[in-house]
């Protein structure tokens, strides 16, 4: 997406992701090779998660690293940052049992939000995306209902959720400013609309 500049025009990405100084990535998992004399939290061989661009080697302050539990698959651990981002929606929305939650956008952060909503005990975890592959993953992750459509084209179906009241929480994970008006229209009266990620 970034390499081929496939992001919405006139967004802050154009300023951030300019070539050739671009360093890709925002999070990494790594194995500690050496430590400084004042580091007591880690030792060589430990696996860590860090908010840092991709690279073969990094010099990091210990305070900017998080331990990965021994035995955890690093392919799973690399999702920690996205899970934390999605957790912000669960925290802000106060996800809890009995709620009716709509997630617009089933990309990586959306997939994590689906899992937070499902594990919270929500009665409905509805997901809107135009990708059948993403919606298949959404079902595996706990979505109770999926809409393979643009949000603008399925508002009537969404508003029929929760006995016609609509979703109590709408999480827009698309990063597309044009979706916001539809997210507002989809929410139940006095419902919450959460923008998660960049727009």
Task: For each feature predicted by the language model, list its residue ranges.
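A structural motif shared across PLP-dependent enzymes of the aminotransferase-like
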Residues: 1, 51-62
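Short, compositionally biased
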Residues: 59-72
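Mid-domain Rossmann-like dinucleotide-binding core that forms the NAD(H)/NADP(H) cofactor-binding site
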Residues: 73-152, 156
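Conserved acidic E/D residue at the C-terminus of a beta-strand in Rossmann-like folds
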Residues: 34, 129, 197
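Short glycine-centered segments of the SAM/dcSAM-binding site in methyltransferase folds
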Residues: 47, 100, 191-193
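Glycine-rich beta-strand-centered segment in the early N-terminal region that forms part
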Residues: 2-52
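Glycine-rich cofactor phosphate-binding loops and adjacent beta1-alpha1 units
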Residues: 93-95, 136, 141-199
């Amino acid at each position: 997406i970034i390499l081929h500049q496939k992001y919405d025009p006139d967004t802050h990405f154009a300023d951030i992701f300019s070539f050739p100084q671009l360093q890709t990535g925002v999070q990494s998992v790594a194995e500690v090779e050496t430590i400084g004399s004042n580091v007591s939290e880690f030792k060589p061989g430990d696996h860590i998660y860090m908010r840092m661009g991709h690279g073969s080697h990094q010099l990091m302050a210990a305070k900017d690293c998080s331990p990965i539990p021994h035995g955890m698959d690093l392919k799973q651990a690399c999702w920690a940052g996205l899970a934390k981002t999605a957790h912000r929606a669960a925290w802000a929305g106060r996800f809890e049992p009995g709620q009716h939650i709509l997630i617009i956008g089933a990309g990586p952060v959306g997939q994590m939000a689906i899992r937070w909503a499902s594990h919270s005990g929500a009665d409905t975890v509805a997901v809107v995306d135009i990708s059948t592959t993403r919606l298949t993953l959404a079902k595996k992750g706990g979505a109770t209902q999926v809409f393979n459509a643009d949000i603008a084209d399925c508002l009537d179906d969404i508003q029929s959720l929760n006995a016609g009241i609509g979703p109590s929480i709408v999480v827009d994970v698309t990063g597309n400013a044009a979706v916001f008006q539809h997210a507002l229209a989809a929410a139940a009266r006095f419902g919450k609309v959460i923008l998660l990620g960049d727009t």
